[in-house]
Swiss-Prot record:
Cofactor section: Zn(2+); Mg(2+)
Name under which the protein is recorded: Ribonuclease E
Annotated organism of origin: Haemophilus influenzae (strain ATCC 51907 / DSM 11121 / KW20 / Rd)
Region feature (Disordered): 571-669, 698-743
EC number(s) reported in the record: 3.1.26.12
Keyword terms: Cell inner membrane, Cell membrane, Cytoplasm, Endonuclease, Hydrolase, Magnesium, Membrane, Metal-binding, Nuclease, RNA-binding, rRNA processing, rRNA-binding, tRNA processing, Zinc
Catalytic activity of the protein: Endonucleolytic cleavage of single-stranded RNA in A- and U-rich regions
Topology class, membrane: Peripheral membrane protein
Length: 935
């Protein structure tokens, strides 16, 4: 049987334990000095708005300011006329000095302040009230099946005010609508008291404090499976009995006072189990152990097999140890109330089925936990990651403090290493200008090491830097701590060395930080909430309605058997009736839960959103109707032009062709009609007057097949124009479409059109005649025969006024300025032709006529005297120049004689291992660095 044990014999600590038999499975400890602030309601003041973080910092009365993100700001704090698109700007919503009602969402942890929210939630016995969050609400995720449907019906019958959200807790299962309505009435009355108290005085102050551990334990842990509540303090027993009588009268008979001689927790043998929650290492029944280390980022858990010998082989031993560790880890997480990221290093298991078995075991073990837990699979490194919701400060945070000696690291530096570090720090302080004395306050062990083993080093520092170093031991100081003070000229202290520790300690106590911390300690007064609790605020004469015992409608055993037999012969229609079980629920519940459904998430107001959606729908409908209407009008006009008979009857019989959603764009159209509405109006006007119809529409209809024929002839694939060309209203350039310059240029001159790319030159390839420089032997012999046979007389040749092979570029404008260039080129060609043999003299002059005899000259007969005696082959007609090979001049340098010397032994000798190096040398030679000289 499960029991709730409440130990309140010591006023400094109140403990609540939940046991199943003699096994502890949940624990809650609260001290008067460590009350949790979570769920407390404060009236705070905005001190700073940070747009980069999308958050504001709130002074709510604590030492550190709270953190209020933008998503946690309720809609009621937005200005009335504030309209935004996308994400709102936090500077437009909150201003510095504004007062807000906030609730602590997460406790302070380390250097982080508390996380706050303006969406207040008040927890009752059966319900959770969210007064300013109407979108939130529902039923607890732990409630399933028929119980869930019953609670939905009960919720629908409740009288809930507008703008209020409700969540039904697991304790509300099986409660009547009257009991739920009573709990709602208590919570609403409590919220009214909170609003009245917030207007009583200015911020910051505490409005509502979360209930103490007794009320909280009764509210959170009191379930139907708890059979007994034992309390060992008469005062706490009376308080708990009154509270249970008011909120849960059906549990009044289960509250009992423990009066045994043996302490309550020792009677059920759970003291040793509670002590295991404070230890770093926890033993397993098989002999293994788990080691739990809490860090700033995560909680690391390591599993060691140690002396575990369960199993026949190593794989079975690892599996059994991991299964035991999975149960114990889930239990320790509840006892220690560890939250955040948890990483478990299981013993390596090779079979995949063993890994899945361990994963399933840990999922089953964490199922009774109140916190939300997410578990991943075991990775290839043997690690399992899981996250646990942080409900309250962990057991270590609430009952432990950081060690003043090691600062929470658990390790202390070695004496010798610490002494050498202090020695280096002393020399750094002595190096500073205007230093007269350096004082160091160290523990006794460090002072002994510095004044004996390192005496020479301290004296050398004093001589080099001309300072005085004083080492003063302090008995109250422990190893890792020390202090170094630097005194300038005129600040010398003429005190005895053993009094320096007291003097410097007194100076440290008078610093600003120490005075501030002492003021905080003296002024720290426990705040009293303006509203004590819902029970105190309400003067309700009547308690919660007692649950009416319902007559069990369960049939007898015989009736069940008969019903089962009938069920076998029932029709299929009865089987297909929907059942209210978990499978009928929305499978996307987790996704819906992850979304924040608060009003701050809606970026636009409802009015603007509805207006915009209506406009969008109207525009889409009009756009879809324009094209079919225009096509119908054009077709009707064309038919009316061909046939004089009315077209309306045929129009009804003819099926309209379905227009494509996206037609191909015809790139050959040069004129586009953008105003569709005007076209439709004109077409409608033409349909009214049938005799005035023109044939223009028929021509438009004939255009389409012409383009289609052209496409079929060319057989080219049209691709969609890229987006960057469509934006610039350009077209894709084809291969056959050569770019033509809109502004022809006669030469590649520098012009703004050419530089900007508006004009370009046609660089089409010109096929020049190839000159054959190499002749075969036959061709060469034929040329020689023709030369021997006859001598051609010199004749005048009439040349037309055309440039022989040079043609102007297309779209070029020839100018007279180019004629002089051509004449100069022609003169240079004539000059080169004069070097040929004087057989034929050709005078190429376009101005000479044929009839003039002055151009004729007589040439003497050419007699060949050359005889060929070599080999026949391909002979090049291109002249070649040859030159003899030359040698590069070299300087006359005589090589020097290489000196030959006898080998000489070294003066240094090696004396064996450990005798080498600078510190073991007999003599040393030093030389100053030299600089290379440049000639």
């Amino acid at each position: 049987m499960k029991r709730m044990l409440i130990n309140a014999t010591q006023k400094e600590e109140l403990r609540v334990a939940l046991v199943d038999g003699q096994r502890l499975f949940d624990l809650d400890i609260e001290s008067p000095g460590h009350e949790q602030k979570k769920a407390n309601i404060y009236k705070g003041k905005i001190t700073r708005v940070e747009p980069s973080l999308e958050a504001a910092f709130v002074d709510y009365g604590a030492e550190r300011h709270g953190f209020l993100p933008l998503k946690e700001i309720a809609r009621e704090y937005f200005p009335d006329d504030y309209v935004f698109q996308g994400r709102p700007n936090i500077r437009d919503i909150l201003v510095e000095g504004q007062e807000v009602i906030v609730q602590v969402n997460k406790e302070e942890r380390g250097n982080k302040g508390a996380a706050l929210t303006t969406f207040v939630s008040l927890a009752g016995s059966y319900l959770v009230l969210m007064p300013n969050n109407p979108r939130a609400g529902g039923i607890s995720r732990r409630i399933e099946g028929d119980e869930r449907t019953e609670l939905k019906e009960a919720l629908s019958s409740l009288d809930v005010p507008d703008g209020v959200g409700l969540i039904v807790r697991t304790a509300g299962v099986g409660k009547s609508p009257e009991e739920l309505q009573w709990d709602l009435k208590v919570l609403l009355h409590h919220w009214e008291a909170i609003k009245q108290a917030s207007q009583s005085r200015p911020a910051p102050f505490l409005i509502h404090q979360e209930s103490d551990v007794i009320v909280r334990a009764i509210r959170d842990y009191l379930r139907r499976d708890i059979g007994e509540i034992l309390i060992d303090s008469p005062k706490i027993f009376e308080k708990a009995k009154e509270h249970i009588k008011l909120v849960r009268p059906d549990f009044i008979n289960r509250v009992k006072l423990y009066q045994g001689e043996v302490p309550l927790f020792s009677h059920y043998q759970i003291e040793s189990q509670i002590e295991s929650a404070f230890q770093r290492e926890v033993r397993l029944p098989s002999g293994g152990s788990i080691v739990i280390d809490v860090t700033e980022a995560l909680t690391a858990i390591d599993i060691n097999s140690a002396r575990s010998t369960r199993g026949g082989d190593i794989e079975e031993t690892a599996l059994n140890t991991n299964l035991e560790a999975a149960d114990e880890i889930a239990r320790q997480l509840r006892l220690r109330d560890l939250g955040g990221l948890v990483v478990i290093d299981f013993i390596d298991m090779t079979p995949i089925r063993h890994q899945r078995e361990v994963e399933n075991r840990i999922r089953d073990a964490v199922r009774p936990d109140r916190a939300r837990i997410q578990i991943s699979r075991i990775s290839r490194f043997g690690l399992l990651e899981m996250s646990r919701q942080r409900l309250s400060p962990s057991l270590g945070e609430s009952s432990h403090h950081i060690c003043p000696r090691c600062q929470g690291t658990g390790k202390v530096r070695d004496n010798e290493s610490l002494s050498l570090s202090i020695l280096r720090l002393l020399e750094e302080e002595a190096l500073k200008e205007n230093t007269k004395q350096v004082h160091t306050i160290v523990p006794v062990q460090i002072a002994s090491y510095l004044l004996n083993e390192k005496r020479k080093a301290i004296s050398n520092i004093e001589k080099r830097h001309n300072v005085d170093i004083i080492v003063a031991p302090n008995e109250a100081m422990e190893t890792p701590h020390f202090s170094v003070f630097r005194l300038r000229d005129g600040e010398e202290v003429n005190e005895l060395s053993y009094n320096l520790a007291k003097i410097h300690c007194a100076q440290d106590e008078n610093t600003e930080e120490s005075l501030l911390s002492r003021n905080v300690e003296t002024t720290a007064v426990i705040e009293q909430p303006a509203v004590e609790s819902a029970v105190v605020a309400l003067s309700i004469s009547e308690a919660a309605p007692t649950p009416v015992e319902r007559k069990s409608n369960e049939p007898s055993l015989l009736a069940k058997i008969i019903a089962k037999i009938k069920g076998l012969f029932a029709t299929k229609s009865e089987e297909n009736k929907p059942k209210n079980n978990r499978t009928s629920r929305n499978p996307n519940r987790n996704q819906r839960r992850s979304q924040d459904r608060r009003s701050s998430r809606r970026p636009r107001s409802e009015n603007n959103e509805t207006e915009r959606t209506e406009e969008q729908v109207r525009n889409v409908r009009e756009r879809n109707q324009r094209r079919p209407r225009r096509n119908l009008v054009e077709e009707s006009i064309a038919e009316s032009a061909v046939n004089s008979t009315p077209v309306f009857e045929a129009k009804e019989e003819r099926t309209e062709p379905v227009t494509q959603r996206r037609q191909r764009r015809d790139l050959r159209k040069r004129v586009r009609v953008e105003d569709n509405e005007t076209v439709v109006e004109n077409n409608f006007s033409t349909t009214e007057k049938m005799p005035e119809v023109d044939v223009i529409t028929v021509q438009n209809n004939d255009e389409k097949p012409v383009h289609q024929n052209q496409r079929s002839e060319r057989q080219e694939r049209q691709r969609r124009t890229p987006r960057h060309l469509r934006a610039a209203n350009n077209q894709r350039r084809r291969r056959d479409q050569e770019p033509k310059s809109p502004m022809p240029l006669f030469a590649a001159v520098v012009s703004p059109e050419l530089a900007s790319g508006k004009a370009w030159i046609d660089y089409s390839t010109v096929n020049l005649p190839k000159e054959n420089h190499f002749l075969s032997v036959d061709e060469l012999l034929e040329q020689e025969k023709t030369k021997k046979g006859f001598i051609t007389p010199a004749m005048g040749i009439v040349v037309e006024e055309k440039s022989p092979d040079v043609k102007p570029a297309l779209d070029f404008i020839t100018q007279p300025a180019n004629e002089s260039v051509q004449k100069k080129v022609q003169e240079s060609l004539d000059r080169l032709s004069s070097y040929k043999p004087q057989e034929v003299v050709e005078s190429i002059d376009p101005a000479i006529n044929v009839d003039e005899p002055e151009t004729l000259e007589k040439v003497s007969k050419f007699v060949r005297t050359y005889e060929f005696n070599g080999r026949l082959g391909t002979i090049s007609s291109v002249p070649h120049t040859k030159a003899e090979m030359t040698l590069a001049k070299a300087n006359d340098e005589m090589p020097e004689d290489f000196p030959i010397r006898a080998w000489q032994d070294s003066r240094y000798y090696f004396y064996g291992k450990g005798a080498a190096g600078h510190h073991c040398a007999i003599s040393h030679v030093y030389s100053e660095p030299t600089r290379t000289k440049s000639e």
